[in-house]
UniProtKB/Swiss-Prot annotation:
Subcellular location as annotated: Membrane
Gene designation: aap1
Family membership: Belongs to the amino acid-polyamine-organocation (APC) superfamily.
Protein name, per record: Amino-acid permease 1
Disulfide bonds: none
GO molecular function, one term: mechanosensitive monoatomic cation channel activity
Taxonomic classification: Eukaryota, Fungi, Dikarya, Ascomycota, Taphrinomycotina
GO cellular component: fungal-type vacuole; membrane; plasma membrane
Amino acid sequence: MTSFTESKKLDEIESPVPEIIVPSTTNGNGTIESYKEKSVGTSFLDFFRSYKLRPDNEFAEVHNSEDFLKPRHLQMIAIGSCIGTGLFVSTGKSLKNAGPGSLMINFIILSAMILALILSLGEMCCFLPNQSSITMYTGRLLNNNIGFAQSWLYFWIWLTVLPSEISAACEVVDFWTTQHLNPAIWVTIFLAYVVLVNAFGARSYGECEFVSSFLKVVIVIIFFFVAIIINCGAAPKGGYIGAHYWHHPGSFRNGFKGFCSVFISSAYSLSGTENIGTAAGNTSNPQRAIPSAVKKVFYRMGFFYIITIFLITLVVPYDNPDLGNVSPFIIAIKNGGIHVLPHITNAVILVSVLSVGNAAVFAASRNAMALVKQGWAPRFLGRVDQKGRPVISYLCSLAMACIAYVNAAPDGSVVFDWLMSVSGGGAFVIWGLSFIDHIRLRYAMKAQKIPDTVLPYKFPGSVYLSYYGVLINFLALCALVYISIFPVTHEKPSAYGFFVSFLGPSVFIAYLLISPIFVKPTFQSLKDVDLTTGRYDLVNSQMYVAESSTSELSEKDLTKPNLQSNDNKNSEDLESNTPPQKKSALQKVADFLC
């Protein structure tokens, strides 16, 4: 899974220290005073007072985690946020079920689809900026009922990420345990860690993500060279391997069924990447941000996924008995006879798994606020504290994480498969509808005779890329249906086997069926689609008119005496003559990779 903070511009200046907003009070005259602000101090009581909920009728915009992060946080998170459980853990099971050939083909197809998705979303988000969630476009451009079902599915996807990551963390810890310990112990420890990180706000989250992203990038780069050394036969153990494992035991396993089985784990690995397009489309310069975002995704998919997975297939055969239980990274290093590095790698994997869980808490709360704004969720989910943090949705995310305690049961390991099915299978529904939204936008513009020249960002042939995306997601859903009915394990068809593979789309269908109870069905033609509210060019023209009127007023004030002090003038001169700061080494690395 991918973090929301990854697509913030890397050259952004450091934000000020967060402020605590004190609720408005009534003074002696009976009038209501405005909110007063005071700096967050070191007072222990102020920390707890900041969590006091605002009145029920007061809702505020959720403070993005980027608002209080330093540039070094944003730079490192942007590089390493795409690396997580999908790459470190899930690829082992996919390699075991499908073989190296199916694994590579599947990831290449989905990576190309993700690039098309970033372009389509970027085009939509530039034209109709949206600060909440990508699912808001479906209700506006397509249908309210479908938008309702998609939004709730997306909320559940992020809500299930935290317990799935904690379940995966329990499996990672098993690498060290020589004696069987109750998994509930580890679940409690990991859950307490997530609570502490989120309790201290965005700064603590940023520090933890900075460290974890740095470690993830370092371990992937180390594995890149170690895998080449092992493959060439220069490791302490083993000889030259080359492409031997692609021939013996082979490139494909379980045929077409094996290929179809990889879709869930691949989607689970890549889900969340779509938020890069949303964030880039909401920047002040989308014409520059969107190409940068596409280049960023291209490099990540190419290096951190395609090349890394290819190296895994070269040094780990699909018939290795440890696959599915141990990370393929660790299996490869152990097979090479390297003794210390497996423990270091496993520790980094544990940190990366928990970091994805931290990011999921932020993402789930953001989608909860989007549901409340649309009137599709209970208002209590939108309650915020004095600093604008969605405390209730945070608590819902943490409460959902308690599902991970099921790992203490004898068959508790299947919980991770169920939770991954919601994220993996549901991602195809989210992506497919996003492509349909983009196609709908283009046809609505034609029906309303809006030229495409008004688009702040336009990619040639983007509509055809959206058709490609719809086709890939439709075929992926068909593959999930096929593998749900006819499992890759050659078992007889069962309800359990069906829902463990098709749970995400099933959640969408369930919400779609009950949507008429909560949402009035709307069937709008292309000419009736709202393409004016919040539109980029219209908002900018209104701002231009406002600025013009302001400038006319300021011209009248030119005849008035200038009351500005010389000290202020001197300070402004100093600021204007200040040379630009040189980029740090970390900024240069980020610019190269991103």
